[in-house]
Regions:
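Mixed-charge (Asp/Glu-Lys/Arg
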Residues: 1-130
Length: 130
């Protein structure tokens, strides 16, 4: 994975952004399930972590937006996580989250990754091993 910054992510189309997130998840040790088409209930990626205790099925939504992610979007993700009996949901964006969306996610199996966290994670995972 080449070095990347928020400016280059902001210029990506949605499909390329999803591909980047898929590669990131693989680097993090997840196994990616192919997602088929637009009738996905808002799911961009289904990922599995097979680690005992902390592992499970994860539903990932990738949002390459120019405005903050709303509470409504997080509520939708939570509904899908519940319906699909996933252990966790991730909303990964190049943007930020509204305070209402952050508050809604608290105490729920939802992880929010904004643009700053995404860049830090990409930088951490693309550094050479010593």
């Amino acid at each position: 994975m080449e070095k990347i910054n928020l400016e280059s992510i902001n210029s990506m189309d949605g499909h390329l952004f999803e591909e980047l997130i898929g590669k990131l998840l693989i680097k993090m040790g997840f196994h990616i399930e192919e997602n088929s088409g637009s009738a996905d209930g808002g799911i961009d990626i289904v990922a599995h972590n097979y680690e005992p205790i902390v592992g499970g099925k994860c539903i990932i939504q990738c949002k390459r937006y120019s405005s903050p992610i709303s509470e409504h979007t997080i509520r939708d993700l939570y509904g899908v996580v519940t319906d699909r009996k996933a252990s966790k949901g991730f909303l990964i964006t190049n943007s930020t989250f509204t305070s209402a969306s952050i508050k809604f996610a608290e105490g729920k199996p939802i992880e929010l990754m904004d643009g700053d966290k995404l860049i830090k994670m990409l930088m951490h995972l693309t550094q050479p091993d010593f």
